[in-house]
Amino acid sequence: SIGDLVARYKKMRGFHVLHPMGWDSFGMPAENAAIKHNIPPKKWTLENIANMTRQLKALGLSYDWDREVTTCKEDYYKWTQWFFELFYKRGLAVKKESAVNWCDTCNTVLANEQVIDGKCWRCDHEVVKKDLSQWFFKITDYADELLKDLDLLPGWPERVKTMQHNWIGRSEGLEFSFEIPALNDTVAVYTTRPDTAYGVTFMALAAEHPLIKKICENNPKADEINAFCERVRNQSEIERTSSESEKEGVFTGVYCINPFTGRKVEIWVTNYVLYDYGTGAVMGVPTGDQRDWMFADKYSIEKIVTICPIGKELKLEEMTCAYEEKEGMLVNSGEFTGMEMHKAMSAIMDKAEAEGFGKRRVNYRLRDWLISRQRYWGAPIPIIYCPHCGEVLVPEDQLPVRLPEDVSFTAGAKSPLATSEEFVHCKCPKCGADATRETDTMDTFLCSSWYYLRYTDAHNDKMPFDKDVNNYWGPVDQYIGGIE
């Protein structure tokens, strides 16, 4: 009724008003409800849409029903698939192996934004990590642009822009490498605090770090390390990163060399480092980071004071926690001793670059958008796998790739689409050889991310929307919805 009030008011003021209605109708809730009532998801969804349409029309709301869009209909998701192909051609849709969030109850992966306090946003079930080959959109390629363009939104609430800033999470720091003589290898770390590099007393690896496999070769501690990694991988991200969670780890028996000091540093596998942020390895500086302090306390690892308050000495025996203040002076830091910490940051990065073991780097908390779902009720991903040609896009004139109806919804972790022989088996559009289709579907947010554009040109069967028509109506003046 709020939207209807605004639309009627603007019409009476002489504005051309676009006030449409549509149905974001793919996704797990509809699929689960259909399964529960033993009815096909399409039938269940369209019957509910018809009922809600009847109710809205009975209320007399001033929607332009001629512009109605329904994301689960073929005339809409054809264009969602078309967008996927456009992104693929431009190198922005990629398939890669990744540790993903997995919900055993929903039998599907979840994007980071769909995990709330370590639980599935739909069913509240605990989420675990699982290695799968998945499709991603490379939104990280646009991280700087997304951040910079927040300044072009002067009317947006500050709390929303702050959320976006934190979600993108831009930071500047140093990436540098520690040699591992026993393995003839190196391990790289990323830090925003290069001024603490002289205080490194251990190396903390994420349980998913690929170096662990090499560390475990002919290592008497391999069973202990692998068991620990398996346990940690099943912990939620919230559980692992919470400041209140117990910091745990296993010493690997292997050492690396701090390039700044030449000192041997123990390599540990820990539960508080995440592989998908930075490099998946963190330099442990107990006196400069509270998590490292707690970890060093638990395992009796050496602590070295490298930063003191200006004009004041910090004695290790008198410290009860890490010194994390933003002002200070370096001590026990070689040629940088006595330097103010912010000046030292730049000077230490200069040294790493000059000596060839490190480089300045910009890092982001933002991750690529995981769009694969092992569910039925979503837009099929228009990819064919050929033994000769590899990944092949479904030709544009063959879109949409339609959802099959002869599927099983009790396939466990297997996508329901994989149970349809007729859907899976096809011919390669390039060479004509026997091939198979991608059986994952797209995240429902893919369909709902562009419907506002389709409203402007809802009956166009030649393209998703006409640019000139969209420019006439856009951008959206008022949107009523959640903070996301």
What are the functions of these language-model segments?
Residues 29-33, 145, 211:
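A general alpha-helix detector
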Residues 1-44, 50-54:
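N-terminal cofactor/phosphate-binding cores enriched in small/glycine residues
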Residues 28-34, 61-64, 473-476:
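A short small-residue
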Residues 21, 139, 178-180, 191, ...:
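Pocket-edge structural micro-motifs
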Residues 1-7, 24, 71-81, 95-96, ...:
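Structured ligand/cofactor/substrate-binding pocket environments in proteins
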Residues 1-6, 11-18, 119-121, 254, ...:
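Conserved active-site neighborhood of enzyme catalytic/cofactor-binding cores
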Residues 36-187, 194, 281-400, 409, ...:
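Residue patterns forming the tRNA-binding/recognition surfaces of aminoacyl-tRNA synthetases
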Residues 175-183, 257-259, 275, 431-434:
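A short acidic-Thr-Gly-centered motif at the start of a beta-strand
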